[in-house]
Amino acid sequence: MSKRAKKRDKLMVEIVQVYSASRDEEQVTDLKKTDYLPYLFNLVMPKQFYKSPNRIVMARLYPDVQKHDEQAAEYFEGFQTPCFDLPTNLFPEKAPIDKIVFMPKVMLPMGFEAGGVFGPGVLPRRCYPVDLISPDHKGPMPPLFVGLRGMNVSLSSMINTFLGMYDSSDGQEPHVYEMHATNHHYKNDLAPEELMLRPDFTLSVAYTLPASMCLPSPYPYPSVPAQDNIYTPDLSKVLILMPHQFNITVAILSTVNNPHDPSVAFATMGDDEDCPEFELPSDVFPICEGVNRPIFLPKRFMPKGFDACCVFKPGSLSELWYIKSIGRFGNPQDQYNCFITPPLFVGKYTRNAASINMLEEISVHFDQKDREIAKSLARLRLDALRLNSRNNTTKGFLVMESDKPTTPAGAYSVESYEKASEDGCIAKVTQECATKSTDTRDDGMNTADYQSQFPELEQDSEPEPEPEPEPQTEDEGEDEDIEILASLCSGSI
């Protein structure tokens, strides 16, 4: 279900679904007569969508907010509007995707190059995105906008400020579920103290131990859209903090800290795992059947100190049940989807076993994590010291001129003396004939000009006159062709 906020006459969609696609720039279609064509220029998407590499977005619309513009529908009838091919993974098979109405560009939201709408009731319930509609929605399906964002989007400073106030990433950003405010008091409402110390069950807190420190993977994981059709988390590393020991306890779980684990789901479906069950109090828990029934977990996926436990998936229990049974005093947990009720843990406490000191176990866990972090920091410091020790060793570079066509082992070729100087060359060995000192090299720079830049290479005394060159054969004359090489020596020169 979408959420909208109004600020400075700008409407914003906070819950959307994003996909990737491409479009031909000249792809257009004719706008036919339609019963629903809203003006969506003021519809602003979340800030993260404008930065995402995925360019297609699906957003729920509200007919009472994004109303049909009858004058625009009559005026643009017959006009050519930009369109694009809908990806096959957007909708299930036999979905009426041909009923989409592509809109004129002036009516699209800012930053979109093409887009269309499905009018109210056009899409059947099975074809509507499950994350954009409440599970208990009744009546015809609301309109749906499907748009393709442009490659380069430039938003005004006012819009950027507005997006900063309502910044939200894709459907994977954690939120905290909050119950709706109400002044209504029910007949059997309990006081806060009675809710915490009620005789049928106790309200606990699910504490998930932080994961061990590990290096990030070089392979990025794609963002998986949240689904609430089944929910079977691994609770073996979860500590259930109870205010007092009782036979049955409940705790709100987090879809962020306690995500769905497919291996747990397969274990519950097989015959090899033992999934102990117990009877839930009928005066407390409603009778949930089908997909909303509680799932009993195998023993190896249970929290410590429990004989049996089960979980209610997100949205299976009504908000009214949470208000009457738990009240507003449940520990808030991060959720991926805050428009349905959070998942619930129900466990049967082990009476015969010794109680577990949860606080001591948490302290031991954090002490272990501190030791791991200290070892990692010590390893990083050692690597840094080794790197500095290698960098502090003085090494000389030698520039040689050779006639060999291939670079010798342990050397690498440079383009010019300037490049050798940039690499740290401090000496030059050359073989020259009795020619003028202003001979021009292949790189266009005079030798005298280069030597003037490095006076430290000049001799203090007057150079002795070079002997007259002996007559050389044709083969020896070819040795005068030079190639600039740089070789790394073991010590300083």
Curated annotation (Swiss-Prot):
Q: Which domain of life is it from?
A: Eukaryota
The protein in question is named DM7 family protein GM11958
- InterPro entries for the chain: DM7 (IPR006610)
- Regions of compositional bias (Acidic residues) in chain numbering: 457-483
Q: Specify whether Transmembrane helix is a keyword of the entry.
A: no
Covalent S-S links between cysteines: none
Entry keyword annotation includes Transmembrane: no
